[in-house]
Amino acid sequence: MLPKLNDYNDLLVKLDYEMKQLNESDNIYDLLNCLLTLNSLPEWIKNSKTASEELKKIALEKEKIMKGENGFSLDEKLLFDDINHQLRFVRLVCNHTKHKTDSKQIPIIESI
C-alpha cells in the first residue's frame, strides 16, 4: 500500500518520516528530501480545504518571503535565529536543485 498525500497534514507526516531518516543517516540526500518537503508546505497549506483561514494567511505570507517578494532578501547572519531567513534559504536551495544557475544568490552546500 502506498501512502497518500492528500493534504498538508499528510505532507507533515512525510516530513516527520524524512526527519527521522535524516537523524539516522546524516546523509545529504535525506537533508535535501527534508528541504524539498519544507519548501512545498506553504503552498499545500494555502491550497488546503481543511486549513483554517488564519493558517492559510500565514502560509501565504511565508510563501512570499520564501520567494523573495516584497524586497525580502536572505541575510546569512540571521540564518540560525530567524525563521523567515531559514525559509528563504530553503526556497533558494530547492530552486537551485531544480534550476541549476550560476547565480550568486544561490547558497552552496558542501558535504564535509
Language model features with spans:
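Extended, well-ordered alpha-helical segments in internal regulatory regions
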Residues: 39-52, 100
